[in-house]
Every structure is written in C-alpha cells, then in structure tokens.
Amino acid sequence: TVQGFDISSYQPSVNFAGAYSAGARFVIIKATEGTSYTNPSFSSQYNGATTATGNYFIRGGYHFAHPGETTGAAQADYFIAHGGGWSGDGITLPGMLDLESEGSNPACWGLSAASMVAWIKAFSDRYHAVTGRYPMLYTNPSWWSSCTGNSNAFVNTNPLVLANRYASAPGTIPGGWPYQTIWQNSDAYAYGGSNNFINGSIDNLKKLATG
C-alpha cells in the first residue's frame, strides 16, 4: 500500500515536506461543495502539494456533493471550473465525488435511491465528457446502501474510495465493486486531514493518475 491523505479548508497550512518524508505520496484536496462554495485554501494547498521541497505529490481535487440542491451536471461543471479537473500530466488524480450525509440535511439529501443513482450518473457523465476520466466515488457502505440501494451501476467506470475509519481492514465493499481503489481509514492523519491508503503499489497510484 501507499500512504496518502485528504485535506480541506480546515487544514489551511500543511507541512507537505514533512508528509512526503513520512512516506505520503498522494493528496486529495477539497475544491468545492454544491454550486456555491469553494475552498479558499485550495490553490495554495494544490501548489504546495506540487512543489513540496522539490518532491511532488500526485494530487487531485474533491467535490462535496449536495445532491438535493442542484443537478449533478451543474455540480460537475462547478467542480471542474474551480480546480477539480484532470490532466494527463501524470501527477493529477481524477476528481473525487464525496457522497455522504451532512449535518441537518436529510441523510440522502431528500432523494430516492433511483434519483440518487441518476444524480451521481449525471455528475459522473458530465465529468467524463469534459475531462475524459470518470470521477472517483467516495462513500461508506451504510450511506451507499441506504441512499443508492447498494447500486452496482458504477463498478465498471468509477474507482471506489472507501471510508471505513479506525478499522484494521477495509471491511465491507459496497455496490458490487470487487475492491476499493483507496481506503480512508482514519480522520486523524499526523500532517492534517484524513489518512488514506492506495490499494496496491506506487505503480497502481501512477496508473490511477494517468488513466
């Protein structure tokens, strides 16, 4: 496995050099949420990950989905316009769509399972049409089961980023995916944000970046 981490505006200043020295090789940075929020620290975080003391991270952005508010296509466009796109430079991950509950919002954002699957597909298809890559999907088994009916509609297109924190193993893989591409196993990474592991070697990480 290869160490990585994900960060947001809650970690405005990150010791990327320290994280690299400790073995981290990739970072996923929050870019947007819904169609009205952008991470004010995104540019500095993204640039910091790219130029960390001469060592670079393979890096990408993520979008926190608000499925009940605007269309999947609109949120994909917003994400791409604010740093979430992809390029074939070998160090850019496909964008990640963060699918989970939030605060006082309904657990499934007020959508039926069928409507949620359609929303995710609309986001995914628009992202693919613009960038040439399908986004990674971040979720946990409970949310995916409750909110998509444990849909297997994305198995052949979208890499799975599995959230299963404070566990000794990835555990249940939802949605028919045979394995997780990335496992988020804690929200307390030493250099900020959440702890992640790529499923495989550095070559697997590079392949994820290059497509």
Curated annotation (Swiss-Prot):
GO terms for biological process: carbohydrate catabolic process; cell wall macromolecule catabolic process; defense response to bacterium; killing of cells of another organism; peptidoglycan catabolic process. InterPro entries: Glyco_hydro_25, Glyco_hydro_25_AS, Glyco_hydro_fam25_subgr, Glycoside_hydrolase_SF. It is an enzyme of class 3 (hydrolase). Its EC number is 3.2.1.17. It comes from the Eukaryota. GO terms for cellular component: extracellular region. Keywords: Antimicrobial, Bacteriolytic enzyme, Disulfide bond, Glycosidase, Hydrolase, Secreted. This enzyme has both lysozyme (acetylmuramidase) and diacetylmuramidase activities. This is N,O-diacetylmuramidase.
